[in-house]
């Protein structure tokens, strides 16, 4: 029996901070992280190189901080530090699962994690290590979605996988409209004209210009990540 070959050799997985909360209202739910890491371990065993960009919304959201009187740049830097905390938690869970993880930060915090250096990140991926990119782009006013698009382009990822709580992009909010249907695939232009809000505008434009496909899928759905990596009809593909 021939084992199926993954459709992608190198992926960039975008995880929101909120995804780490599980059913909690705040913070990091250990059981949720362990389950996510098991899904990631499953695809690394297939020989897929995995890089992760993690958000920080479960701890602090820069946008929210800025909206209540805090200086926006300061709030964004706090958000970046929140992503470092999440990245450390994720890497710790990976190490306990038998994966080798390396956290690389876009801001200097050398006693805790190593700085992001592109050739080093590529070397880690080639060695089969999981690279977790922390601190977004290192700049205020840029989201972690934009960091995912940027790092995806930099490392030559074949696809950006945006992990959400919904299994793809729908014609309407499936939680509110039972008749909403899932798009199997969309072009970048179609997604823009329908104003579907898949990524923020900067991230979306970067992916479109670099012809870097995006696949939106549910991280809550067991086995969905593996199905995506194997090229099965899972989630929604946005392509050039």
Curated annotation (Swiss-Prot):
Catalysed reactions, semicolon-separated: UMP + ATP = UDP + ADP
CDD domains, per the entry: AAK_UMPK-PyrH-Ec
EC number(s) per entry: 2.7.4.22
Top EC class, one word: transferase
Signal peptide positions on this chain: none
Keyword Kinase appears in the UniProt entry: yes
Pathway(s) of this molecule: Pyrimidine metabolism; CTP biosynthesis via de novo pathway; UDP from UMP (UMPK route): step 1/1
Location in the cell: Cytoplasm
Membrane spanning residue stretches: none
Binding, ATP: 14-17, 57, 61, 164, 170, 173
Subunit structure: Homohexamer.
Listed HAMAP family: PyrH_B
Family to which this protein belongs: Belongs to the UMP kinase family.
Protein name: Uridylate kinase
């Amino acid at each position: 029996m021939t084992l199926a070959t993954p459709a992608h050799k190198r992926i960039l997985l975008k995880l929101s901070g909120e995804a780490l909360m599980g059913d909690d209202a705040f913070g990091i739910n250990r059981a949720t992280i362990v389950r996510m890491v098991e899904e990631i371990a499953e695809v690394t065993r297939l020989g897929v190189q995995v890089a992760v960009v993690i958000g920080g919304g479960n701890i602090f959201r820069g946008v929210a901080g800025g909206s209540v009187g805090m200086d926006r740049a300061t709030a964004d830097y706090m958000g970046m530090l929140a992503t470092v905390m999440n990245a450390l938690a994720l890497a710790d869970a990976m190490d306990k699962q038998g994966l080798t993880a390396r956290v690389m930060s876009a801001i200097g915090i050398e006693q805790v994690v190593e700085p992001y250096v592109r050739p080093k990140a590529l070397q880690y991926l080639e060695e089969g290590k999981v690279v977790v990119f922390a601190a977004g782009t290192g700049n205020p006013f840029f989201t972690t979605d934009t960091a995912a698009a940027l790092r995806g382009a930099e490392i030559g990822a074949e696809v950006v996988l945006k992990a959400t709580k919904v299994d793809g992009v729908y014609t309407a909010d499936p939680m509110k409209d039972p008749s909403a249907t899932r798009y199997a695939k969309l072009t970048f232009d179609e997604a823009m004209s329908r104003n579907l809000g898949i990524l923020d505008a900067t991230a979306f434009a970067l992916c479109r210009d670099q012809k870097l496909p995006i696949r939106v899928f549910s991280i809550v759905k067991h086995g969905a990540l593996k199905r995506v990596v194997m090229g099965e009809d899972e989630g929604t593909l946005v392509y050039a």
